[in-house]
Amino acid sequence: MGYDSQVRTKKRHRITVVCTNCKKRKSKCDRTKPCGTCVRLGDVDSCVYLTDSSGQPESSPSLNDADPLRKQSTPAERISPGFIKKRRSSQTRQDEDHWQRVRELESQSSLYYLPIHEETPFFIDLIPNGFYLETKRSADNLFGLFTDRAIENRDPYLQAMVTFRSIAIKKMMDKLGSNGNNVKNGSLPKSFEALSTFDADDERHISDDVVDKGNNFRMHQTIHKSLFNKFAQYRENNAKKFSSETILAKDYLPPLKILESEVLALFEEKIYNMIPIFDMKILRHEITIFYQNIVEKGNPISIKHYDHMVFCIILLIIKICRLSVQFSKLTPYIYPVLQEIDTSKFLALVKHYLFETKVLRKCNFLQLQCLILLRFLHWCAPEDGDGPETQYCQILMGTIISSCKEMGINWYCFSHPEKYSFKINRHTRPSYDIMKPSDYISVFRKIWSYVLFWDRKMCFISGEECQIGKTLQCHFKEEADTPTWYIRMLTLDNLMKKINDTLNDDPGKVDLNLLHRLINDLKRNFHILKSLSKNEKETMRHFDFEMEWIIDLFSLSLLHGEMIFYEYDCNITKFYKSFQDLWDMVIHISEKCYNYFFNSDALEVDSLTKFYTNRIVEIVANKVLVIVPAFILRGDRFKTIQYADKKKMIEFLYGVSSVYFNEFGFEYYRCFRKMFTAKIAYKILNRSCEKDAWRIILKFLLNELKLEDNGDSYIDYNDMRLKDICPIILEFQETVQKYDGYRPDILSIWNNEFYPIGKYNDDMTGFKFQMRIKEMQEFLDMEKYSDRFNIFSSFYDHASSQLAKHTEVDTNISITNEQVAETPQKELLQQPLAPALPVNDLIVSEFDVIEDIFDPVDFVSFF
């Protein structure tokens, strides 16, 4: 045998010619790692090369098989530390059927999902006017990309309208204050002063009107006062102070038998799946011990032994269960004892005890569960826990996430569950007798999946950046490995995190094509997961419902940002398309809101879970109210949008506002306080054809800038200047001042010179706006509240008979600007420029401009 034949040839283990992505796409691959094509398409994380030797992908860690906790693998079975190798035993018939269904659903979902190949990045700027940061006495806030404030700051039309509205309200409050008519309520925040004052003035006018005396006036007076008092009581209760020595648990808690039979039974059956952070057997044990030692024996609540945390958990569970029954609208006889429990002081008690511990330094198991329950309550409760735009939720959420990481509740409880080594001390609560290491891992998984989803959820709702920066690709082998809905959603976490990164890594340069592709992937995968759960005894329909609405909300906010970008970029074709797409999305979401309120049986949402689903519906409906004015203010720029179409949009806004505030305004503090500015916005937009709202807003703000320059502005010198609050108006003023010797119509300057997309003609693209009247009909024929009190139409609205009596004198002294108001929009820029008005005349004229917007029927006493 020759030498060559005796030497064994060494086999080369070279990588395949292309990465798995390029192989799937049938595209070119430069064989770098990651390859250039994947870098360009944003698929860096999934750019994988398969080797001939092992056949294992070189990818980020993934959880391919999450075995039950008590079936730990031996070291020989592990392919790598913490990850369990797939066993070669044949699958059961049930597992085969399960994954056969997955493949069938994937093929079905492909009918409506078309993957995008070789799509070049397309970047848009979601912060054309920068980030929106607000500082005030009590808090500083950087608002997320999709909050109301950020949307208004991004949109020049909404920004100008909101600026005008705030200045007009300030002037009116100064007018009332000088007359001694301002109203204050010590239990309400300072921002409520305008609401109370305007409503009191409204009430005075109604009481003076003989026509309105009687039932209408008494109803107005009773309902309005009760709402102000109700929300003032919320704040007073939550601000109550306690002394630990005087707190007796039996004064606040029902007997143990009632707690177990009514409260815990309801919690376990209907609510636990929403917040599955407990082992219910262990929780019941701790509650029983607490009642035996504290309630029945009358012992003081021990902070050292963490009795106070068990007490807080009981209080929060009772309050959450009571909310469930309260918002279900079921007969009070179903849970009579529960509804009799006074929970008004519970939140103040919880806050008192939470800060008795070193919550900012260290955390234990019960304390973490209490914090999570508090976060859940802030989300669902009618009090203003999260703030009107969820801007106050990140600090508590950050505390929860930090506490989880400090306690070892993280991705390791899924990827390396066998690596945890516990030392459970004798005084730990829950004790070792009742809670073993395997129980810890089980609850750790439940808590981490819950906290993780809420972190991702807030990114989709408000556009804020996720606080948990790590994700893993999770694939569970059996349905038994996903005991909660949140654990099942871990398979979507990688996609949700990619969406967050694409959005927040650089908001000024967001890859829109990649974002659309990721959203489509998320919809497709969620559709598969949702379909797989249909055979379960408990479908958890409210979770699927919320997830669908969250995705729709994200799409709505993104569409608005997309439209604004095309407008700034003067991309007329894409602007028109996004304008129509955004309007269609608004109509679609509004229909969903209508069905939620008036056809809820078809949604298959349990009425006892509505206290939870109400929150996402409230956020989505409010977003519609924020965005619709942007369409109305832009209406004059489209030939195909006539005045009659704008009136339909305004009627639609009125209908959506009536539904939103009548369904939520009586109960939710944050909705009630938004009603004031929403009503003002409606009055701004609901103008006659001659008094175009956008022209009047521009004119008012230009006059205000002139007053600032002359030092005669009503704005306090401690406040920011208009030119700093709304820089786009300062730029517009500079453009207007270029027309020396001429006085053109300001709308012509705005559309043709300053904001040049308006100069394009609809005929250039063949664009024809589709109003979708048929889909809007429920809101145009708003008869739902015709036979009962409509809170939206009632608040801040004077009787029409007040018009003549209060405006006759004002009309005689006002300097009207009817000629300017009636100027055609497309007027040629050739008229001589009239001399500037004196400062005093500017002030009178400015109030006249406010009268053009606010019908004297509403705010006649201010002039």
Swiss-Prot record:
GO biological process: positive regulation of transcription by RNA polymerase II
Gene3D superfamilies listed in its UniProt record: Zn(2)-C6 fungal-type DNA-binding domain
Alphabetical keyword list: Cytoplasm, DNA-binding, Metal-binding, Mitochondrion, Nucleus, Repressor, Transcription, Transcription regulation, Zinc
InterPro entries assigned: OAF3, Zn2-C6_fun-type_DNA-bd_sf, Zn2Cys6_DnaBD
SMART domains on file: GAL4
Region (Disordered): 52-81
Biased composition (Polar residues): 52-63
Stated family: Belongs to the OAF3 family.
Function: Transcriptional inhibitor with a significantly increased number of target genes in response to oleate.
PANTHER family cross-referenced by the UniProt entry: OLEATE ACTIVATED TRANSCRIPTION FACTOR 3 (PTHR31069:SF33), OLEATE-ACTIVATED TRANSCRIPTION FACTOR 1-RELATED (PTHR31069)
Protein name according to UniProt: Oleate activated transcription factor 3
Natural source organism: Saccharomyces cerevisiae (strain RM11-1a)
